[in-house]
């Protein structure tokens, strides 16, 4: 039986992955309130379609940081893709390249960056950085991703400490042993990934540190994990190039707002000075449309990509992306939007919010 929506991929992954792997992918912090609210919040939003418009041609293309993508649906950084499929991030990168979208590679990738790039040399790729306490290690990693052709540096800011994920504690998940990570050398050998993956994330990083990162790279810097207008204003003040509104998929601090509920606050605060993106809770084309109508330039998808990997590797990820893109095309057509530029707040029934 074919899988026709992202929920189908979720159920397939739940049935076929080991319990510890499923718990790791699906888990949220504490009571998982925020994880679940990320999806539920979208369903509270109603659309205001416009009709009798010529929608015989609908163009989903847009740009992020100046690069064109086929649709405003890209791949969020998630770690350890080999948990879901043997080729891991290489399969993910190939699917993203085939779909002409951006893939943000995680610090916690289970394939070497060289192998990921070689698998999809023409793909648009950004790199997500967890800040290491050792500045020299950060510097080497930034230089490495620049040399490999990554086009942006995404700094995750919402993990000064790893959230309390009860399933991982219960399962005593030891990802390093389970994955048997290979291709990991020393910094002298040009691969610093294991030093990130086996060390704590720097809890001391603050706004003033951003200037150091900016001095280390010419890449645009995107901050991932912003949820408030205060932090959005500070991000603009410190000259970042973009913000990903995110609560880490509900895996960090529980009982914070759903990403879509925080989006309008952040969009209003930046006043168009930087691009704003969203991750968290995207499961349908309508979800994508709602996020764009509320001001997101693009959305990033996390868990569904791993579900696609678990189904059929590269081809499973491509199927997930194709379903989302086809649904989004339908949503645009049925609301009278002929281009992404025509998607705006007029589509949202604010009296319900």
From Swiss-Prot:
GO terms for cellular component: peroxisomal matrix. FMN binds at residues 77-79, 106, 128, 156, 224, 279-283, 302-303. The active site is at residue 248. GO terms for biological process: fatty acid oxidation. A motif (Microbody targeting signal) lies at residues 351-353. Its main location: other. Residues 2-353 form the FMN hydroxy acid dehydrogenase domain. Belongs to the FMN-dependent alpha-hydroxy acid dehydrogenase family. This is 2-Hydroxyacid oxidase 2. It comes from Bos taurus (Bovine). The lineage of its organism: Eukaryota, Metazoa, Chordata, Craniata, Vertebrata.
């Amino acid at each position: 039986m074919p899988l026709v929506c992202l929920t189908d991929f979720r159920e397939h992954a739940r049935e076929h992955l080991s319990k510890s792997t499923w718990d790791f992918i699906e888990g949220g912090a504490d009571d998982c309130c925020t994880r679940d609210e990320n999806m539920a919040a979208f369903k509270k939003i109603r659309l205001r379609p416009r009709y009798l418009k010529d929608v015989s041609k609908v163009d989903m293309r847009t740009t992020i940081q100046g690069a064109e993508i086929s649709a405003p649906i890209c791949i969020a950084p998630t770690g350890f893709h080999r948990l879901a499929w043997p080729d891991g991030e290489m399969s993910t990168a190939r699917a993203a390249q085939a779909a002409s979208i951006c893939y943000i590679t995680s610090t916690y990738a289970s394939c070497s960056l060289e192998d990921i790039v070689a698998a999809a040399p023409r793909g648009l790729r950004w790199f997500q950085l967890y800040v290491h306490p050792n500045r020299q290690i950060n510097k080497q990693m930034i230089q490495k991703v620049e040399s490999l052709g990554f086009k942006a540096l995404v700094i995750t800011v919402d993990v000064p400490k790893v959230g309390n994920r009860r399933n991982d504690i219960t399962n005593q998940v030891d990802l390093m042993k389970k994955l048997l990570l290979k291709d990991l050398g020393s910094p002298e050998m040009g691969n610093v990934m294991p030093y990130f993956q086996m060390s704590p994330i720097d809890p001391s990083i603050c706004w003033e540190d951003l200037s150091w990162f900016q001095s280390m790279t010419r890449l645009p810097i995107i901050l991932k994990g912003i949820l408030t207008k205060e932090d959005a204003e500070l991000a603009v003040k410190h000259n970042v190039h973009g913000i990903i509104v995110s609560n880490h998929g509900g895996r960090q601090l529980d009982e914070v707002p759903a990403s879509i509920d925080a989006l309008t606050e952040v969009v209003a605060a930046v006043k168009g000075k930087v691009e704003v993106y969203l991750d968290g809770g995207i499961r349908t084309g309508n979800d994508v449309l709602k996020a764009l109508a509320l001001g997101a330039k693009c959305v990033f998808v996390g868990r569904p990509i791993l579900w696609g990997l678990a189904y059929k590797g590269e081809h499973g990820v491509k199927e997930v992306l194709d379903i989302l893109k086809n649904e989004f095309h339908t949503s645009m057509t049925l609301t009278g939007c002929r281009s992404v530029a025509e998607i705006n707040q007029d589509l949202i029934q604010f009296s319900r919010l």
